[in-house]
Amino acid sequence: MSDLTQAAATAPDTVAQAVPPPRGRVRWVICGLLFAAVVLSYIDRLVLGVLKPQLTALYGWTNSGYGDITGYFQVAYGLGFLLFGWLIDRIGPRAGYMLAMGAWTVGHFAQTLVTSTTGFALARIPLALGEAGTFPSALAAASQWFPKKERAMAIGIFNAGANVGAVVTPLLIGFLIADLVLDWRWAFIVTGLFNLVWLTAWWQLYHPPHSHPRITPEERAWIEAEPVETTGRAGFLTVLRHRESWSYMTGRFLIDPVWWTFLFWLPDFFHSRYGYDLKNFGPPLVAIYIMADVGAIVGGWYSSRLLKRGVETGRARKRAMFACALFALPVMFAAQASSIWVAVAMIGLACAAHQGFSTNLFALPGDQFPRYAQGTLIGLGGFAGAAGGFIASKALGALLDRVGSYQPFFIACGVAYLVALLVFHILNPRYRNVRIGGV
């Protein structure tokens, strides 16, 4: 990226061991902004899922129709990931994040104007396109602001914003619609206003390390103490020539559908299986996503701890991913749980496993690729994940209309992570730095 700082020639692992953490915490303020953006992204994304039982009763939606809304959202999201992956490499995360949140705020407000599944599917296209810029922008910012030894932890922190957003959404929407007895459209209006506050804060507070007015010299040196990287650009075809790219993309294709379907369909599962509604969705969803929040942080902490103990980067990432894959297995039995809280425990454990697994998978572009190629790879990975999510959402909607059972979905969720890790290891056994264009 053009606005990256000059770096020292010392290897990052050596520097991290020789230099103590610096004075100055600007990078953690940046991490806090990234965390807040992910929270808002997930709130805006999940409002519709929480409202689904009410909107289905009001407007006669079918599961297949709702599957179309979520499926086409993911198509637009995948295309947006390709766009923003390419764009962030060229304009940087500051302008990129402004553009992304501006677009998704327009789409979020547009949902107040429609009632049919077709109308919602169309209104959510700009929402999906804009939200697709969240992780390319956040990961690019993390690559700017955090050395390798801290990067997985930083990613884990802002990745946990997804779970905080998922926790807040049912409580907030339940308060607005069930307690205050407001029209459902107010759920979109109130949550959309939060985005405008964040946009103002981001524009004022985010700058790259070399030009940030509040960074200390010690903190800048800590961030810049990595090998100088040759600047350049890498297109899609260039990135796709490398097996390491396919390991990342395949991982996203296999595990992202699990998270997507949990996000969009869990309220419906609790409604159809246990009779829960907008007034009592809160406690089970809060419990699930608090568990997921812990998983995101622990997954990043565990691999970062292994790295600080001298474990090779690829081995540390894969150890953490394997542990997470094992914790996902019990969710295969969630559909048969007689008690909602047994189901919550199984699903929450799987969500924690997903977040820990994805935290380490998301670290791959920063670990293995030059910075000018990372956004492109992240975009390709997001497209692959959205493609998998589209297939899963369409299939689940049709399955529910025909047989009314979530059982096949939960079985697939349980085994997805072990399969993903196996394919990942086959395609990326040595986890070495990728050379692009002779760099």
Language-model features: where?
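A late C-terminal transmembrane helix in Major Facilitator Superfamily
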Residues: 366-403
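Extracytoplasmic gate region of multi-pass secondary transporters
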Residues: 48-49, 243-299, 354-358, 362, ...
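Residue-level signature of mid-helix packing/kink "hotspots" within the transmembrane helices
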Residues: 46, 74-82, 166-167, 289-293, ...
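Helix-breaking motifs and short loop linkers at transmembrane-helix boundaries and internal kinks
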Residues: 60, 92, 113-119, 130, ...
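Helix-loop-helix hairpin linking two adjacent transmembrane segments in secondary transporters
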Residues: 158-210
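Conserved MFS/SLC helix-loop-helix module at the cytosolic interface between two early adjacent transmembrane helices
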Residues: 79-118
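Structural signature of the two symmetry-related core transmembrane helices
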Residues: 95-109, 315-332
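Cytoplasmic helix-loop-helix junction between adjacent transmembrane helices
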Residues: 123-162
